[in-house]
Amino acid sequence: MRKYMRGVTLMELMIVVVVLGILTTVAYPSYRQHAARAKRTEAKAALLQIATMQERFYLQNNAYTTNMTSLGFAVAGNFMTDSNSYVISVTAADAATFNATAVYQKADAEAGKCATFAIDGRGVKTSAPSVDCWTNTRL
């Protein structure tokens, strides 16, 4: 009696490759959108933290500051978010108000919708080029 070798046929292999290709085509854009939203959330959280620290500094010193170490950060000037996507900085500060910004640093498709976030001493939140990046979580 003859024994047959068992294995994967070329047709089965091709079907697996096609199914994986379809799954990748569907899943990858969704993954990219999720990653972009996570980076934006990280930038917004950093700006809100700076706003909180600025208010604490103001209560103690009766003025705002551009020096990040005065706010409790390890660096005096700009710093990057943990994902290295946004540069966070306090661009202006005086006795009346401050302005903190987060600017996207990479040259890819994610930068198009929410490249810049800002918050000031009055709590006004702005973004560019899209004006609703702070409130719209689907961007």
Please give the residue ranges for each predicted region.
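N-terminal single-pass transmembrane signal-anchor helix
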Residues: M1-Y31
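Residue-level detector of intrinsically disordered/flexible regions characterized by low predicted structural confidence
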Residues: Y4-M5, T41, S127
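Preference for short coil/turn "hinge" residues that link or interrupt alpha-helices
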Residues: V19-G21, A27-Y28, F57, Y64, ...
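Glycine-centered loop/turn positions within well-structured domains
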Residues: P29, E55, D132
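Alpha-helix exit/C-cap motif
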Residues: R37-T41, Q49-S70
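Periplasmic/extracellular, small/polar-rich flexible segments of pilin-like filament-forming proteins
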Residues: L59-L139
